[in-house]
């Protein structure tokens, strides 16, 4: 009776490499062999524009992501996207609004231009984010820290994990990122019990767009292995 299986492309707070497009293709084919009717969905957050192809081009039925991450190019102020099979998009649109209207109507709050401009600029923005992640990984590796992925590894998201080893080190790192930010550099982040998280979380994001992860930011749950 399984209707859908999903996979998260990005590392998230885990200690693993992001799932590559080739691995997603293998997963899609594996699921299809078991049951061709199962919907195969990919959480594509942080992974857009890392490769020439996106998951829907290697067999995923539907993907979803956030516009304040990669595809918004740092300009989109809010929003998300879903794309994939037309019949699934229609069903999703009916759930988001109401049957019969679907995606034909809906508020954009005047954000269409910045969303489209952000999408246009996104590949270059993601390119810069990846270079920054590689540089960060190399610097901290030379300082003796364990990093994931390694600077020379293939990447499938923009996340760089650094194992800092203690709660104090995690908080100090995030406070350093915030202090060097262009916005709210006077703020000193502290862990707190954020809704939706199992552990206290500390977040540094001195970004022009609230909550943006395509700008330089750092966040972590206060739990082992403290990365």
Give, region by region, the residue ranges found by the protein language model.
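Conserved PLP-enzyme active-site core in the AAT-like
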Residues: 1-127, 131, 137-140, 144-148
């Amino acid at each position: 009776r399984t209707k859908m299986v999903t996979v998260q492309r990005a590392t998230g707070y885990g200690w693993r490499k992001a799932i590559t497009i080739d691995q997603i293709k293998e997963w899609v084919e594996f699921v299809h062999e078991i049951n061709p009717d199962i919907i195969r969905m990919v959480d594509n957050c942080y992974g857009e524009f890392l490769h020439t192809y996106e998951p829907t081009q290697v067999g995923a039925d539907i993907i979803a992501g956030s516009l304040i991450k990669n595809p918004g190019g740092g300009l989109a102020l809010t929003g998300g996207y879903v794309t994939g099979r037309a019949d699934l998009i229609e069903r999703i649109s009916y759930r988001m609004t109401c049957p019969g209207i679907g995606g034909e109507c809906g508020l954009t709050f005047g954000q269409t231009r910045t969303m489209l401009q952000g999408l246009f600029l996104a590949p270059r923005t993601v390119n810069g984010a990846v270079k920054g992640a590689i540089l960060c990984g190399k610097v901290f590796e030379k300082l003796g820290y364990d990093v994931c992925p390694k600077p020379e590894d293939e990447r499938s998201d923009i996340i760089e994990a650094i194992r800092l080893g203690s709660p104090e080190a995690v908080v100090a790192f995030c406070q350093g990122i915030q202090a060097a930010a262009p916005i709210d550099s006077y703020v000193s982040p502290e862990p707190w019990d954020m809704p939706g998280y199992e552990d206290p979380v500390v977040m540094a994001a001195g970004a022009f767009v609230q909550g943006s992860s395509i700008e330089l930011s750092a966040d972590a749950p206060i739990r082992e292995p403290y990365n």
